[in-house]
């Protein structure tokens, strides 16, 4: 083990090497290059779904780099020929809300925000939590699909840093500070 000045020296040397090398953006779940969007399947193969104006395909070794926080689960391999409309019967939502949900899902395919917030509002037992779990499982499955509301700005930022979709359960109200913080993610 390196201690004291030896550790400090090693950090200084490695920092110097890092500063002289090319830097790369690191993405979480969804990344991009000049002409394509990539969705990390987060499996052992490190394959990704490449999306272009011509369609999509699964690729080995995508040209973008992804990070995978603890708790991130792999996405199932997509199958050609499906329709987003097959999702509608699984959700408790009306026709107008369904249009907003589809727009929200589409926005999540953009590697850089801003992103709209999706808020389910309703009485107890109206499948708000269930809807959140279903939608999160589509693009960002994780061990903890829904979290408790954040108590501090730091809690919110940690949650947002560790998942592509941050979903909170039993958020009875959104105060001004939390509203501002959510808009800054």
Model feature map: region roles:
Residues 47-51, 129, 175-177:
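Short helix/loop capping segments that flank catalytic or ligand/cofactor-binding pockets
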Residues 36-37, 127, 170:
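Glycine-centered small-residue hotspots that permit tight backbone geometry or close packing
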Residues 1-96:
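Segments of Walker-type
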Residues 165-185:
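Conserved AAA+/SF3 P-loop NTPase catalytic/coupling segment centered on the Walker-B
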Residues 38-40, 119, 166-167:
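Structured core elements
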Residues 53-164:
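P-loop NTPase catalytic core of nucleic-acid-dependent motor ATPases
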Residues 45-46, 125, 172-173:
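Conserved nucleotide-binding/hydrolysis micro-motifs of P-loop NTPases
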């Amino acid at each position: 083990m390196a201690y004291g000045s030896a550790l400090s020296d090693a950090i200084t040397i490695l920092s110097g090497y890092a500063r002289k090398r090319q830097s790369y953006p690191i993405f979480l779940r969804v990344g991009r290059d000049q002409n394509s969007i990539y969705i990390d399947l987060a499996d052992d193969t490190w394959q990704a779904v490449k999306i272009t104006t011509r369609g999509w395909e699964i690729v080995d070794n995508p040209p973008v780099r992804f990070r995978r926080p603890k708790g991130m689960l792999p996405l199932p391999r997509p199958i050609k020929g499906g329709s987003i409309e097959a999702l509608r019967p699984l959700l408790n939502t009306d026709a107008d809300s369904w249009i907003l949900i589809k727009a929200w899902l589409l926005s999540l395919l953009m590697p850089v925000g801003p992103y709209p917030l999706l808020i389910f509002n309703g009485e107890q037992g109206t499948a708000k939590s269930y809807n959140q779990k279903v939608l999160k499982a589509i693009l960002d499955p994780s061990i903890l699909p829904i979290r408790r509301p954040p108590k501090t700005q730091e809690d919110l930022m940690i949650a947002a840093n560790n998942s592509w979709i941050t979903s909170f359960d039993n958020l009875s109200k959104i105060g001004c500070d939390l509203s501002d913080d959510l808009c800054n993610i």
